[in-house]
Design a protein with these regions (language model features):
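Extracytoplasmic
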Residues: 8-10, 14-19, 37-39, 87, ...
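Active-site SXXK
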Residues: 13-42, 80, 192
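Short, hydrophobic/aromatic-rich segments at coil-to-beta transitions
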Residues: 163-170
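Active-site-adjacent helix/loop patches that line small-molecule binding or acyl-intermediate pockets
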Residues: 46-47, 56-144
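N-terminal carbohydrate-binding/catalytic regions of secreted carbohydrate-active enzymes
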Residues: 1-4, 21
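Short, well-structured active-site flanking segments
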Residues: 29-52, 142-147
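Structured C-terminal helix/loop/strand segments within mature extracytoplasmic catalytic/sensor domains
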Residues: 3-4, 11-12, 100, 137-154, ...
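Structural recognition of the beta-strand scaffold that forms the well-ordered cores
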Residues: 16, 79, 91, 113-115, ...
Length: 271
């Protein structure tokens, strides 16, 4: 399909929590390949502690577990994908050999060559993430549970600001940084990647407007017959998402705009 990118698509940007998308993909791939069980437990050690995230408070791993506890992989993946939990992310990449080792593993999702700071710092670039999201979308089965969590993470945020559950997205925010990578699970699939220092609420609304513009544009192309050569049966299989067990108890003091759980289709939680 068509690929439109900005002139700086190869430039690395501060990734914020978008790094958790390739991280969780690697683990779901390991599960699918039988290399690890979702019930396998990983120890929460002191070096995995993360400072409190003021923009994403009440992250469940720090609230439910203490240093020394062992946490099932499935809980860590739920926390990292649905809540963007920083401790979960740290535990997951440490158990791949550390952050740099994880980033080297994750290069397989793109044919683009990466610079040194890609591996040593929390940075990503649109050339990489567009390939990453395409792989996520086109791979049926392996990532269905991950697609589920990403569908219900922040339904009124970023690309989904005006269109709850429209995009399957992973967001990243830290101070003025507002990043998002995602795709539209439709009969006219397309992906969007934005790395910005656009600011807080006004930036998030602007990203939502961009999401709406892209959606309308590709919907119009579909209505005009521009997708006639695309196999719609492929789209239907790739639109599938899983139905994983909800393991983490939702926290009642979570801000309303972060209560993905209120629109959760299953509505059941286990403490």
């Amino acid at each position: 399909g068509a690929y439109i990118k900005s002139d700086n698509a190869a430039d690395n940007n501060l990734a914020a929590s978008t790094y958790k998308l390739p991280l969780t993909m690697l683990w779901y791939e390991k599960i699918a390949n039988g290399e690890v069980s979702p019930t396998q437990e990983f120890e929460f050690t002191e070096n995995m502690l993360e400072k409190e995230d003021e923009e994403n408070p009440n992250q469940p791993i720090g609230a439910k577990y203490k240093v020394g506890d062992k946490i099932p992989l499935s809980n860590l993946l739920e926390a990292a994908a649905l809540y963007s939990d920083n401790i979960a992310g740290h535990i997951l990449f440490e158990n791949l050999g550390g952050y740099s080792a994880f980033k080297h593993m994750a290069t397989k999702y793109s044919e683009h060559q990466q610079s040194k700071d890609f591996f040593n710092e929390n940075k990503l670039n649109p050339d990489y993430t567009m390939d990453l999201v395409r792989h996520l979308y086109e791979t049926s089965g392996t990532y269905d549970d991950l697609k589920y969590w990403l569908t219900y993470a922040g339904p009124h945020m970023f690309l989904n600001y005006n269109n709850p559950h429209g995009y399957v997205q992973k967001v990243g925010n830290n101070e003025e940084i507002r990043n998002v990578i995602g795709y539209a699970p439709t009969l006219y699939p397309f992906s969007v990647c934005i790395y910005s220092q656009i600011g807080d609420k006004e930036g998030e609304k602007l990203i939502g407007d961009i999401g709406d513009i892209c959606w309308a544009y590709f919907e119009q192309k579909y209505n005009n017959g521009d997708y006639e050569m695309y196999d719609s049966s492929l789209a239907e299989s790739r639109m599938a998402i899983g139905s994983p067990q909800v393991a983490l108890a939702y926290l009642p003091d979570l801000p309303v705009d972060q209560r993905s759980t209120l629109e959760h289709p299953h509505g059941k939680t286990n403490s």
